[in-house]
């Protein structure tokens, strides 16, 4: 659900109940463990203290337990693990992941403890073995580095791989890794808020790139869970549609018939008479936006005064 200044679970107790009644399985983001939204902590930071398991374990364990108690009678997917305070690396700040490589071993050992205790909380609160409650561990940013150098979670947990925040998949499981009972998932972005630049409010993901990356994802057995970071809904209607249609039927579109998808979308929005031209525009729009996003654009981009004829080269 939406994040930033909002909290799905805390802002209105009817949110979770309504979702459950409608058969909708909810979850939280990669940095919001144990069914707790970040804003629930941020709003009471003076009361709770520092978001650091090494120094504030008692408070954090209670915070985690309250989250599981709240969703124990739902089918909600539980995020386990822990990152820093507010989508940052453990003990660090957003956009500076590389500065904390020398803390990897320390952070890995701390994360092992966090996950072990979280699993115990899940077992204690639900009264069932932890492996009977669906959980996901996001291998996002610096956490992928932990995985690559040896950090592992129990086999029943879904491993959520991620793109690079710009629509390019960072990692896929090999043949041996694909044998995990918990399976694999993908967290994909068409909207991004973070370093080095935001990308929001406009679709900057080329149609062909998104199709190719999601097709690759599926071909490598990453099919247990797909999550799309969409930001604002209205400008992302097309990539949301493509993502959901591919999740429903990953083999429906090929390199040869891919443009049938945006044409079908445009026909529904604008009618058959305008569909061909609208498809052409939509395709070029995402192509050009993907080359240079609005946040990256400046007076030197496609400069008509340079001797390299940038504008005509890129518009071909």
In which residue ranges do the predicted regions lie?
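Extended substrate-binding grooves/exosites of carbohydrate-active enzymes
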Residues: 230-276, 280
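Gly/Pro-rich turn-and-neighbor structural signature
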Residues: 13-21, 56-181, 290-297, 305-316
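Feature activates predominantly on carbohydrate-active enzymes
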Residues: 1-60, 72, 76, 131, ...
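Short catalytic/ligand-binding loop motif for oxyanion handling, primarily in non-cytosolic enzymes
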Residues: 35-37, 88-90, 233-237
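Conserved, mostly hydrophobic/aromatic
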Residues: 159, 217, 229, 265
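Hydrophobic alpha-helical scaffolding
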Residues: 50-57, 101-108, 146, 199-207, ...
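C-terminal non-catalytic alpha-helical accessory regions
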Residues: 259-316
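Short conserved micro-motifs at the rims of enzyme active sites and ligand-binding pockets
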Residues: 91-93, 149, 170-172, 196-200, ...
């Amino acid at each position: 659900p939406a994040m930033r200044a909002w909290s799905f679970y805390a802002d209105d107790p009817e949110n979770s109940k309504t979702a459950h009644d409608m058969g909708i399985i909810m979850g939280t983001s990669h940095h919001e463990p144990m069914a707790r939204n970040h804003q629930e902590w941020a709003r009471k930071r003076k009361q709770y203290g520092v978001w650091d398991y090494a120094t504030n374990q008692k408070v954090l364990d209670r915070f985690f337990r309250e989250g599981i108690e709240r969703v124990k009678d739902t089918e909600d997917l539980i995020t386990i693990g822990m990152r820093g305070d507010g989508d940052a690396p453990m003990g660090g700040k957003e956009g500076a992941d590389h500065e904390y490589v020398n803390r990897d071993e320390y952070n890995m050992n701390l994360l092992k403890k966090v996950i072990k205790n979280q699993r115990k909380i899940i077992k204690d609160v639900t009264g069932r073995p932890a492996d009977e409650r669906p959980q996901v561990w996001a291998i996002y940013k610096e956490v992928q580095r932990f995985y690559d150098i040896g950090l592992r979670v129990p086999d029943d947990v879904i491993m959520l791989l991620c793109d690079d925040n710009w629509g390019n998949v960072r990692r896929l499981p090999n043949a041996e890794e694909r044998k995990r009972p918990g399976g694999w998932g993908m967290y994909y972005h068409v909207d991004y808020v973070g370093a080095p630049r935001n990308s929001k409010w406009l679709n900057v993901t080329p149609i062909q790139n998104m199709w190719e990356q999601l097709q690759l994802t599926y071909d490598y057995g990453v099919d247990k869970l797909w999550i799309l970071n969409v930001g604002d809904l209205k400008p992302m209607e097309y990539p949301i549609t493509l993502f959901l249609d591919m999740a429903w039927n990953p083999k429906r579109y090929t390199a040869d018939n891919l443009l049938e998808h945006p044409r079908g979308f445009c026909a529904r929005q604008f009618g058959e008479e305008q569909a061909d031209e609208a498809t052409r525009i939509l395709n070029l729009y995402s192509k050009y936006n993907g080359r240079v996003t609005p946040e990256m654009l400046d007076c030197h981009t496609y400069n008509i005064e340079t001797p390299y004829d940038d504008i005509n080269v890129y518009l071909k």
